[in-house]
UniProtKB/Swiss-Prot annotation:
Subunit structure comment from the entry: Monomer, homo- or heterodimer (containing two subunits of similar size). Each subunit contains a covalently bound flavin. Enzymatically active as monomer.
Organism ancestry: Eukaryota, Metazoa, Chordata, Craniata, Vertebrata
Keywords of the record: Acetylation, Catecholamine metabolism, FAD, Flavoprotein, Membrane, Mitochondrion, Mitochondrion outer membrane, Neurotransmitter degradation, Oxidoreductase, Phosphoprotein, Transmembrane, Transmembrane helix
Location of region: Interaction with membrane phospholipid headgroups: 520-522
Cofactor: FAD
Cited function: Catalyzes the oxidative deamination of primary and some secondary amine such as neurotransmitters, with concomitant reduction of oxygen to hydrogen peroxide and has important functions in the metabolism of neuroactive and vasoactive amines in the central nervous system and peripheral tissues. Preferentially oxidizes serotonin. Also catalyzes the oxidative deamination of kynuramine to 3-(2-aminophenyl)-3-oxopropanal that can spontaneously condense to 4-hydroxyquinoline.
Protein's UniProt name: Amine oxidase [flavin-containing] A
Reactions catalysed, as given in the entry: a secondary aliphatic amine + O2 + H2O = a primary amine + an aldehyde + H2O2; a primary methyl amine + O2 + H2O = an aldehyde + H2O2 + NH4(+); (R)-adrenaline + O2 + H2O = (R)-3,4-dihydroxymandelaldehyde + methylamine + H2O2; dopamine + O2 + H2O = 3,4-dihydroxyphenylacetaldehyde + H2O2 + NH4(+)
Amino acid sequence: MESLQKTSDAGQMFDVVVIGGGISGLSAAKLLAEHEVNVLVLEARERVGGRTYTVRNEHVDYVDVGGAYVGPTQNRILRLSKQLGLETYKVNVNERLVHYVKGKTYPFRGAFPPVWNPIAYLDYNNLWRTMDNMGKEIPADAPWEAPHAVEWDKMTMKDLIEKICWTKTARQFASLFVNINVTSEPHEVSALWFLWYVKQCGGTTRIFSITNGGQERKFVGGSGQVSERIMQLLGDRVKLRSPVTYVDQSSENITVETLNRELYECRYVISAIPPTLTAKIHFRPELPSERNQLIQRLPMGAVIKCMMYYKEAFWKKKDYCGCMIIEDEEAPISITLDDTKPDGSLPAIMGFILARKADRLAKVHKDIRKRKICELYAKVLGSQEALHPVHYEEKNWCQEQYSGGCYTAYFPPGIMTQYGRVIRQPVGRIYFAGTETATQWSGYMEGAVEAGERAAREVLNALGKLSAKDIWIQEPEAEDVPAVEITPSFWERNLPSVSGLLKIVGFSTSITALWFVMYRFRLLSRS
């Protein structure tokens, strides 16, 4: 691709200033520059990428310590990365996955661990079916308008799980499902928001799956290259170490000021940072009350991403692929994936320390976390080789002042219906991007691209360069990564829930008892 570079300095007039040099902000800037709009990106850190970050050193070659995964139906990030010359590779699932629960290891294949207890199976099946059916009622672009929005928004996911699930095993796995997908606790998040989140990621199976799901692939060379290559195209239109502290749109032109006292003038602003981080910026005039309230009410999830490197992929000797789903309160890690390079070099296991565990384990030394993780892997995989890594990398996203956490912001109960509708609403000449504002794969790189390009098209419309009907556009399917439709089986659709089974049994028992009484009465009458 040809360079989009254009000289820019403080004091120069720009058409658009983008706040935030993550994938969302940079995809917005790229689209604007392609339409010959004079754009400047102001990034607070010494690097671009935001919540994606590829670390490079002699021990790991490269490693994604932030957002990394892409898969079918994530067509915008796949199209953008292809334009930038990046390739993907599939995360290894050739061997068996592992489910560790109640101190035992159970190998399996597929998206979810199998359940052998028939009552528990009915409970699990009803859980996924109910969540997906509830999600179908929720508009992806306006969850606050769902028919049961107010009712579901008053509930936490803990409330909903307890309402749906009869068995302890299903309740525990459902809680883990929340931890893994949104790095927060079931009692912290709105049921409406979580059901919407799963729905806009394609449903319970798509969001949780590796094959044909959200974790199917990674980028050769790391996901950080997406932002780095856009930065190369934009050249000095991207300013690093420039945290924005002040936005004044009270005059004809907007004034943007950074922490190091640089001033920039522009016609429009795109904010492409997590909603809560806009509280670090002073606005003139003040933000509308709903927007001001919203940004104070969207906490970030908590996660420490951990990569353990080994001399060889010893887990493959046992026909394990490296993916572990771990149900154990004392275990630091809740889920792992193979993080070996696509050519088989640098064998590694990636694991997430999630939610409450991230808070707890952030308080101990890195060496203690490393030891606890190795001991866990040795126990789950049944191999002492897990105790002898050759290198360890980790990233605690809760320490990042310009992210505040990962993967995404979440909505506590009551916030979506009260304030959610303003999340994408412009404030004067300020427009909002960031993965939290997306309607498909929000929380992922795909959502970041959708939001950035949508905000850019909103500005292009304001500049008279684009029709309003072209702001929201459908993305064609990526030919290189086709999606296979996920269709529930006949039994998955029609098996009763545990409560349904009890009703059937109760009804059958009543009919049998009635028949028996009538039969006996007939015999007595004849005698």
